[in-house]
Regions:
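N-terminal Lys/Arg-rich, disordered targeting/topogenic segments
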Residues: 1-8
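Periplasmic c-type cytochrome electron-transfer domains
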Residues: 9-16, 21-479
Length: 479
């Protein structure tokens, strides 16, 4: 009897241990890993601007830490306005900036989606509320400065549980469990992750290295170092964020500035993976939705009056000077590669991408089940369609020419230093204000003499008479 009683007690104890372990596992899953879907969006534009792409679990920052960082570390913010100082766009009444997603993965987290770089902003005058254009290039978004901000905050001694919880308490009353979780798990883990990210991005902070600045990143080096896991080299591939509206006009044409990727779905997927998304079945469906949305999203209409007669004259000039590369038609070079020897623009972005990078990236994409067409190494830049060209300033692949009028000038007469990132539009020159006093105060000083910033090349139309240039610019405003 005694032996049987001992055995029964042992079994009961084992069952209790299993129950307790299961309960603990459930609590741990619920508190840190459960995923709740976002509330449904009322529009496709809203889904594009704020919808999750699945980056919160691996790259998200806890919502309340995200909220308090600019208040805790104002000296690390480059200007007034909190996160707005980094050029992110914030719609009136919205909880987060455009391109920032909020999703519960155990607890509310904030991550990014494509809209953080691909939503344009413009004002027709300084006192006007900005107009936001989904899928346009955010020429003001200083992603590099934002990365540096998070890293600098994490390295600050005040990034600790006591100080952060005290700041959170000013805006939110956390439960006792959440306080414990933040104190002993979440805050230490976030600090560690941000410092690790700082180390991963140390290559962009080398002495004398050119800054990305607003509206740019170094896309192919990011692919080499993070997706392909290749060693850091000495290339500079800084490039402008492109417009991604109306993607159906690019069907069958190479993508990226250098034509290194064959399909729009591949470009969208690679970019989303770079933001920390995980290649789940849900993610693949979301990328399909995104591709469909962007395929049919029209380019924005020019917001200023247009001289119809002058634009009609300019259409003829365009047909003679530009259409062979930038308009569809028999024998058109639209969407094809223009060799660097012909186009003559800065080749640093081109040289940053290598055959080794393409091969390694293709292997990784295949392993992840998201290889929608092999990446390649090329030797030139793509002749792109010009729909909505008025809102794509500054111009060339590296954003080295401030406006279309300057692009029609010989290299020696193009602006050498200007200020980018200011969103008041300059209709006369077809671009943004880059030399006014407000532009100088708010903008980033761009010097074409820095490595990768060259404004040479693309000499088409530079020899046109002044009247034909004016007519051509009037027509380009209508595209």
């Amino acid at each position: 009897m005694g032996g049987r009683g001992w055995w029964k007690r042992l079994r009961r104890g084992a069952v209790m241990l299993v129950v307790v372990a299961a309960g603990g596992a459930y609590v741990g899953w619920y508190a840190f890993f459960r995923e709740e879907p976002q509330p449904p969006f009322t529009s496709a534009d809203g889904r594009f601007k704020y919808g999750s792409i699945g980056a919160e679990s691996s790259s998200g920052i806890p919502y309340w830490i995200f909220v308090v960082l600019p208040r805790m570390f104002p000296e690390h913010v480059p200007g007034p306005g909190g996160y707005r100082a980094f050029g992110v766009l914030w719609e009136e009444g919205e909880e987060l900036p455009i391109g920032f997603t909020k999703k519960v993965v155990g607890f509310p987290r904030v991550a990014n989606n494509c809209a953080v770089c691909h939503t344009a902003s413009y004002r027709t005058r300084e006192e006007e509320t900005p107009t936001y254009v989904p899928a346009g290039p955010n020429h003001a978004s200083n992603v590099q400065a934002l990365l540096r901000f998070f890293a600098t905050c994490a390295a600050d001694p005040r990034f600790n549980a006591d100080d952060i919880l005290a700041e959170i308490a000013l805006v939110e009353r956390l439960s006792w469990f959440d306080k414990l979780a933040y104190r002993y798990l979440i805050i230490p883990r976030v600090k560690q992750a941000l410092l690790h990210r700082r180390d991963q991005f140390a290559w962009m902070d080398r002495p004398g290295w050119p800054h990305w600045g607003p509206g740019r990143d170094d896309p192919m080096n990011l692919t080499k170092y993070f997706m392909a896991n290749l060693p850091v080299d000495d290339t500079v591939g800084n490039a402008d964020f492109p417009a991604i509206w109306n993607l159906k006009v690019r069907d069958g044409k190479a993508l990226q500035w250098d034509g290194s990727t064959p399909l729009t779905l591949a470009v969208l997927t690679d970019s989303a993976l770079g933001l920390g998304a995980q290649p789940t079945d849900w993610f693949k469906r979301e990328m399909k939705w995104l591709e469909g949305y962007l395929r049919n999203l029209p380019a924005p209409t020019y917001p200023f009056p247009v001289d119809a007669a002058l634009a009609d004259t300019g259409k003829g000039v365009f047909g003679q000077a530009c259409a062979s590369c930038h308009a569809p038609g028999p024998g058109s070079r639209l969407g094809t590669l223009i060799d660097i020897a012909e186009i003559g623009t800065d080749r640093n972005r081109l040289d940053a991408w290598t055959e080794a990078g393409a091969n390694a990236a293709n292997r990784v994409r295949t392993e992840l089940g998201v290889n929608y067409g092999n990446m390649t190494k090329t030797n030139g830049y793509i002749a792109v369609p010009l729909d909505g060209i008025w809102l794509r300033a500054p111009y060339l692949h590296n954003g080295s020419v401030p406006n279309l009028r300057a692009l029609l000038e010989p290299v020696e007469r193009r602006t050498k230093v200007f200020y980018r990132g200011y969103d008041v539009y300059d209709p006369r020159n077809v671009g943004f204000e880059t030399q006014s006093e407000p532009a100088r105060r708010a903008g980033f000083r761009f010097d074409v003499g820095e490595r990768g910033n060259g404004n040479q090349g693309h000499l088409y139309g530079t020899d046109l008479p002044a009247g034909q240039k004016d007519a051509l610019l009037e027509y380009l405003r209508t595209l």
